């Protein structure tokens, strides 16, 4: 089975680095027609792309090496080998990625979208077990990783908090990692100490994903954030090259911004406005790394200076659990991002993002709830993208991304659960005879 029409077109636009408007002109169609082709299959306004257009797009992508230096061929080896850590299929830092490998992962995520939306079903990880080892509080990340693994047919074992771990009895990270490796096929680890996830990973050969290591990194969050930005920019007719990104809040301890700015630094001529209270600035070593590719870094202490003209505003929660008492003094209500601030300094196509959770209590120095119904607020579209991105991560690290293309339509799987005996159906113009006895 080929990839979906939506994934095919997104891949073409990314490979050619074109906005929707320019891409539509390039292939000789109206923007409105392209928009209907990019909708999820099954939606009311979805339209099938004519075969002649599909052939034309394929020819452009194959022959039009407009940005060949940005495009990674599959002939260069499997993606998991290109992002491997010391020969191991693990995801510990965004430093493992090039721009090409990021976009290759996003192509896999595009393929996962109909499975994430439950329009199709995949069982490629059936029998595999994920160990979610969270030694620090988490809701979204833990559930998102678990859901992603289950969407591919696997099962999940959860461990949360030090008090429920043998590490509370003095067990070492090394011992814990070695023991868990015998129980599960992959691990996602969150730990309050920077560098601890890498220590877990060194003790095992199974895939390990960094779910957040103290103030260090959060690579899967950065990947889903970048995927969201590129998806929103495609809709708005923008490119990340040359964009203005404002990051606001606790930039010292906020691991999501540490990973995201390094990932976006793979693009060119990006302007980063880093807005934070004094004492909570972005670490200097990250600023130095983000300054490559002609990117501009400006550090600000007020929202008015940092938000003006921003294409993306990325707000972060105050990491009070990592503060020394005196560090909290500089964080005032002046750093609350609300609708009045956005209207005053930003345009109608600014994207407002947040890794969540946000402090929604009245007067909190965070992203205000008065933006909840503002179309510029992308935080829930952002969280929705966590499932396909994390599905893509698991598929790549476990080497099953190619098998996902053989996923069955969701309605056929439903029939298997409600019908006994022999089921015959047609899928992609091929006759299948499924012999499976199902309990009712």
Where would I find each of the regions flagged by the language model?
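A short, Lys/Arg-rich alpha-helix, primarily the initiator
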Residues: 1-16, 54
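Short alpha-helical "recognition helix" segments of helix-turn-helix
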Residues: 23-24
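Recognition helix of helix-turn-helix/homeodomain-like DNA-binding domains
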Residues: 29-48
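DNA major-groove recognition helix of helix-turn-helix/homeodomain DNA-binding modules
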Residues: 48-68
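Positively charged, low-complexity intrinsically disordered leader regions
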Residues: 78-143
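Phosphate/diphosphate ligand-binding glycine-rich loop within oxidoreductases
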Residues: 123-230, 360
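Glycine-rich phosphate/diphosphate-binding loop of Rossmann-like nucleotide-binding domains
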Residues: 140-147, 238-315
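Rossmann-like adenosine-cofactor binding region
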Residues: 290-369
């Amino acid at each position: 089975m080929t990839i979906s029409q939506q994934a095919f077109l997104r891949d073409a636009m990314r490979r050619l680095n074109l906005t929707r408007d320019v891409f539509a002109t390039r292939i000789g169609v109206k923007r409105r027609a392209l928009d209907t082709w990019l909708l999820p299959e099954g939606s009311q306004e979805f339209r099938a792309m004519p075969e002649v257009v599909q052939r034309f797009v394929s020819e452009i992508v194959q022959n039009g090496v407009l940005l060949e230096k940005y495009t990674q061929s599959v002939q260069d080896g499997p993606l998991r080998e290109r992002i491997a850590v010391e020969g191991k299929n693990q995801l510990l830092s965004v430093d493992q990625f090039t721009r090409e490998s990021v976009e290759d992962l996003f192509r896999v995520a595009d393929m996962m979208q109909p499975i994430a939306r439950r329009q199709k079903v995949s069982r490629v990880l059936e029998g595999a077990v994920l160990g979610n080892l969270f030694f620090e509080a988490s809701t979204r990340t833990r559930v998102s990783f678990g859901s992603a693994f289950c969407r591919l047919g696997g099962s999940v074992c959860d461990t949360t908090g030090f008090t429920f771990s043998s590490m509370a009895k003095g067990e070492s990270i090394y011992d814990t990692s070695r023991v868990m490796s015998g129980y599960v096929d992959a691990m996602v680890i969150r730990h309050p100490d920077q560098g601890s996830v890498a220590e877990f990973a060194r003790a095992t050969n199974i895939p390990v994903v960094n779910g957040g290591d103290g103030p260090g990194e959060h690579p899967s969050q950065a990947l889903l954030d970048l995927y969201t930005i590129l998806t929103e920019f495609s809709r708005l007719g923008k490119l990340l090259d040359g964009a203005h990104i404002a990051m606001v809040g606790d930039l010292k301890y906020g691991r999501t911004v540490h990973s995201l700015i390094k990932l976006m630094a793979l693009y060119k001529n990006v302007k980063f406005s880093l807005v934070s209270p004094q004492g909570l600035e972005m670490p200097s070593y990250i600023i130095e790394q983000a300054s490559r590719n002609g990117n501009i870094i400006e550090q600000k202490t007020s929202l008015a200076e940092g938000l003006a003209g921003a294409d993306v505003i990325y707000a972060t929660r105050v990491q009070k659990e990592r503060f020394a008492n005196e560090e909290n003094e500089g964080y005032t209500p002046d750093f609350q991002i609300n609708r009045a601030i956005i209207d005053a300094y930003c345009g109608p196509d600014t994207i407002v993002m947040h890794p969540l959770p946000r402090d929604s209590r009245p007067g909190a120095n965070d992203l205000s709830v008065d933006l909840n119904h503002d179309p510029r607020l992308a935080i829930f579209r952002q969280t929705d993208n966590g499932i396909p991105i994390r599905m893509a991560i698991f598929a790549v690290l476990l080497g099953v991304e190619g098998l996902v293309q053989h996923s069955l339509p969701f309605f056929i799987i439903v029939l298997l659960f409600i019908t006994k005996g022999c089921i015959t159906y047609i899928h992609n113009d091929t006759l299948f005879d499924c012999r499976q006895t199902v309990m009712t």
